[in-house]
Design a protein with these regions (language model features):
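Class I SAM-dependent methyltransferase SAM/SAH-binding core
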Residues: 32-137
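A conserved beta-strand element that flanks and buttresses the S-adenosyl-L-methionine
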Residues: 149-151
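Class I SAM-dependent methyltransferase Rossmann-like catalytic core
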Residues: 1-36, 41
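Conserved S-adenosyl-L-methionine
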Residues: 261-270
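Conserved beta-strand signature within the Rossmann-like core of class I S-adenosyl-L-methionine
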Residues: 170, 174-187
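A short, conserved alpha-helix within the catalytic core of class I
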Residues: 158-174
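Core SAM-dependent methyltransferase catalytic element
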Residues: 269-285
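C-terminal alpha-helical "lid/dimerization" subdomain adjacent to the S-adenosyl-L-methionine
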Residues: 191-256, 263-264
């Protein structure tokens, strides 16, 4: 299911309008390192790292259930199909072969840069179980690097008491800046997107085959013959929207953590989809 979420995020880029705010937040807090929580398959934080002009030096991804192939899966990209000579000649008066070579070199350079700046913590990270300056994973305690904590499309997985516990632990024990973003909400546009999810899954499946090389016959059978996958993806999206937290509820939670300065709001993203953002940073005394 995370494959479909990743593909949808790459195509529609719903979080891109918020990247400027995140970049400014990092600058204000003088941060060049990010620890992404509940990363799953990566998604938006990888896009942010790729398009940000070198402010972010290192990104650590983490999850309670990290992918077994982690970084290889995250950084896998496939060169786009080459454009025809005729299209290049119509677009610009230069050698099409020179443009093709330049485009391919740019792709390889970006991929190499991404691989060198992104790491996936191999240990399972349970963000609800903290010790001072560390996180607990079953019986293993290990230090989490310093840096801004980010979360994308993750907050709706937690209840209000859990969100408060998470924020308070980060504020009192980590003392690191926090940025959380959600495209799931109870807004009508969000439910409209959920309604067309089955159609999107039908179109995204060939993309998974071409771009991520997910060549499993079961995926096609459970998508086109017996549409179990579209049903589960749709239900997952619906439940996520229903479990999302409103701005008012989050403001009430964060008001109980006066040690941090909090900024909570909504930015309009692609297709007018609302993006909820939460920024928290240690209060200057």
């Amino acid at each position: 299911m995370t494959d479909y979420i990743r593909a949808a995020l790459e195509i529609w880029k719903p979080y891109h309008p918020i990247f400027k705010k995140l970049d400014n937040f990092l600058a204000v807090n003088k941060q060049t390192q990010i620890i992404d929580l509940c990363s799953g398959s990566g998604g938006p934080i990888l896009a942010f790292t790729a398009q940000t002009n070198s402010r972010v030096r290192q990104v650590f991804l983490s999850d309670k259930f990290p992918p077994s192939n982690s970084i290889n899966y995250l950084t896998h990209t496939k060169d786009p199909p080459k454009k025809t000579c005729a299209r290049y000649f119509r677009a610009k008066r230069e050698s099409p072969f020179k443009s093709i070579i330049s485009e391919k070199n740019d792709i390889l350079a970006n991929k190499t840069a991404l691989q060198s700046s992104v790491s996936y913590l191999p240990q399972p990270v349970d963000i609800l179980r903290y010790q001072p300056s560390s996180m607990l994973t079953s019986d293993i305690s290990f230090n989490i690097p310093f840096g801004t904590r980010t979360m994308f499309t993750a907050l709706h997985h937690f209840s209000a008491p859990q969100v408060y516990r998470l924020f308070r632990n980060i504020a009192l024990k980590d003392r690191m800046p926090l940025a959380s973003f959600e495209v799931t909400s109870k807004h009508p546009i969000s439910f409209l997107m959920i309604a067309i999810t089955p159609v999107l899954v039908f179109f995204l499946t060939p993309l998974l085959l071409w771009r991520y090389k997910e060549r499993r016959i079961s995926r096609f059978i459970l998508t086109y013959c017996l549409p179990v996958v579209p049903l589960f993806v749709t239900l997952d999206g619906l439940i996520s929207c229903m479990n999302s937290h409103s701005n008012n509820s989050l403001k009430k939670l964060t008001s109980r953590i006066p040690e941090y300065d909090w900024t909570i709001g909504v930015e309009r993203g692609a297709w007018l989809l609302p993006i909820q953002y939460i920024f928290g940073s240690p209060r200057q005394v």
